[in-house]
């Protein structure tokens, strides 16, 4: 076999499709998994799938949004309002970190965030980063799916951000409705002492628990019937499928302490977000 990448490329180009197929089929699963785990992207980030035209469409994931010949099934897709905050909270250009104190130091935590250096700048960076992610991952995708004839795409934006103050820093501003925060609500994982006593801000638990129950009800109804509707008991605001024009598009998931649960017709497009940025300059 090849001893380096150049030799491997040369060998691959000299082989027929059938020979490549036979080579892969002859390998043990462990060999294939080892090769995948050792693969590294040429730049940064994770190793990406590639559109081979067999497993993945030649047009990549984009083609799956617009190809009306594909089988369509109901989908739930969504993002979090403050998606980027978790990652940016680790960036020392935005947040000052310092020695942990008190019980946090006792349990072995050495450093903790202690100050957002420029709150307005931090909020702006996170708003646009999170909003453009929503635009790419949900809104543009959903619009393309509707055009291709897919009418059972249920979108959401998770907005809950009623977090506690830790080490003197308001977590609702530092983290907010950040990456993966919704997972706790989908699975109702509130029994942990740490979650109950350190996640929720003052007075936030009852409304947060109610929101979790609502989310689970929507998810369960979707699993049963392919549409979240009004939840299992039929007593929640109707979660409608994404639609075009000025109609309702996605469900905002927040607690009664703030906005509550409601449908929104505000679509995040590149033009909309760029216009906002010009207003703020």
Give the ranges of each region predicted by the language model.
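Short, charged, surface-exposed loops that flank catalytic or proteolytic processing sites
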Residues: 2-22
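Substrate-gating cap/lid region and adjacent catalytic-acid/histidine neighborhood
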Residues: 17-206
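Mature extracytoplasmic/periplasmic domains
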Residues: 163, 225, 229-264
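Non-catalytic, well-ordered alpha-helical segments in soluble enzyme domains
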Residues: 207-230
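C-terminal beta-signal and terminal closure region of outer-membrane beta-barrel proteins
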Residues: 265-271
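Conserved small/polar residues in nucleotide/adenosyl-binding loops
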Residues: 279-281
């Amino acid at each position: 076999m090849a001893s380096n990448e150049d030799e491997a490329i040369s060998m691959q180009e000299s082989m027929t499709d059938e020979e490549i197929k036979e080579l892969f089929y002859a390998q043990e699963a462990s060999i294939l998994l080892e090769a995948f785990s050792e693969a590294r992207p040429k730049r940064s980030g994770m190793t990406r799938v590639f559109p081979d035209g067999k497993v993945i469409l030649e047009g990549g994931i984009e083609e799956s949004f617009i190809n009306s010949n594909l089988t369509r099934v109901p989908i739930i897709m969504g993002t979090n309002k403050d998606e980027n905050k978790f990652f940016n909270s680790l960036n020392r250009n935005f947040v000052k970190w310092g020695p942990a104190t008190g019980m946090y130091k006792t349990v072995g935590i050495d450093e903790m965030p202690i100050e957002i250096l420029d709150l307005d700048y931090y909020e702006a960076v996170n708003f646009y980063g999170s909003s453009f992610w929503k635009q790419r991952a949900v809104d543009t995708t959903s619009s393309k799916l509707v055009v291709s004839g897919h009418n059972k795409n249920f979108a959401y934006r998770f907005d809950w951000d009623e977090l506690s103050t830790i080490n003197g820093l308001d977590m609702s501003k530092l983290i907010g409705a950040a990456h993966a925060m919704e997972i706790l609500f989908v699975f109702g994982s509130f029994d942990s002492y740490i979650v109950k006593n350190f996640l929720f801000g003052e007075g936030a638990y009852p409304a947060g628990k109610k929101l979790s129950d609502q989310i689970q009800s929507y998810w369960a109804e979707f699993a049963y019937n392919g549409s979240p509707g009004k939840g299992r008991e039929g007593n929640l605001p109707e979660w409608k499928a994404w639609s075009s024009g000025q109609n309702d598009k996605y469900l905002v998931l927040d607690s009664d302490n703030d906005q509550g649960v409601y449908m929104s017709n505000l679509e995040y497009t590149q033009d909309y977000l760029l216009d906002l940025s010009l207003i703020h300059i």
